Amino acid sequence: MIVTSKQVAKLGTITSEYEHFNEWKDPYPYGLSDISEDKTITSQDVLVQGTLTKGNLLDILRIFTLFVEDPKGMGVIKIAPRYQQFRTVKKIVKRVKEGKMPDEKGGIVWHTQGSGKSLTMMQTVRAIYRDPELSGFKIVFVTDREQLEKQLKDTSKSVGYTIHDAYSIEKLKDLLKTDTPDLVMAMIHKFQEREVEEEFPLLNKSDKILVMIDEAHRTQYNILGANLRKALPNSIKVAFTGTPIGKTEQTFGDYIDKYTVRQSVEDGVTVEIVYEGRTHSAELSDEEATNAKFEDVFHAVEAEEKQRIMGRFTWRAYLEAKEVIADKAKDMIEHYITHVFPNGFKAQVVAVSRLAAVRYKEKLENALEEKIKELEENNTKNIDLDTLKKLKVAVIISGSPNDDTQVFKNEYVNEHEHDKNIRSFKLPYGKSDEIGIN
């Protein structure tokens, strides 16, 4: 569905909210000169050239249009591609078909966070398997976080493909040894033998394997990345990243496509990050006991190294201190209720550690309770107290076998609780359990 206003045109679907209609800013594989060489080119001109030419329109319908469950619980919604997703998939397929060597067939996709990389990866799967020359490829997804793995699996359902989960090292080896054209999902740490000294084996020499690595900048510069390349030496590797660093290009080659933060903000896909400095006056209690404990643990360490350790761990201890967190939590609640909550928005707090996250929950709840009592006596700004009283604070942290269960309660590390809280957080107020702060 296309909406127009004067010279501006945007693409969406019958289920799209207005904010999800987007301009089509690149007519790829055409250039602007294909539209006109002697007149001003409008937004409408670019969209018509980029989406309504016969080949592009058919591809948008067959490859790029998806049906997914509405995260707001409103049933099934229809999703149209954004121009950078269409362009990237086309470039990946072109490179895979035209490159001479595996390194020439792969490369880096730099798409900023929140721009739909998971959908782009699944649209690539569709495009590969619809191409007669490439339909025999095995496609391997590699990620380094369970959240990303789950996101890719959920996205795969929307395109009608089943992903084989390499839930163990041995299962991974079995799946990669075959030349069957299927989808395999693996966490990067599966590319490591249980015994550190043991080398990871060569598993498949086929050049009909496409490896797509999500958030590649985080994982590919150590032995695990080397093992991946050793296991599949002739595979084509496409690295997706939202925050590229120098080593990404050194490892995976040149860029296939770029979609930067600035472009994303200009397109309204992501919001601009605004930084506001805050100060507080909290002081640590029992400093003498803290220093004594430090000396007890590090008494045998040389003075220079001790200073380095003290600088690193004193700062972390400071950020985890209950007094500091309580002071910050009070300031956060004050700012949130004054500037954010009245606009219907929720809030996220990123902590320095899991311990700090758990402590923030307690202190935010305390600060919220105090603020509500204050507003019950004096509510000159007419804050919605009924909704505010339902507001909940949730903790989302990962578990560890070494956890102190008294500190990290099961509910804090339980994936089912995580999913429930995240779903609630994504819903607007009035349509959820009112998880307002994560």
Q: Which functions belong to the PLM regions below?
A:
Residues 1-138, 147-162, 179-180, 189, ...:
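ATP-dependent helicase/translocase motor core
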Residues 100-105, 134-135, 177-180, 196-209, ...:
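Short basic/glycine-enriched coil/helix segment immediately N-terminal to the Walker B
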Residues 183-213, 218-227, 435-438:
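Conserved RecA-like ASCE ATPase "motif II neighborhood" in helicase/translocase motors
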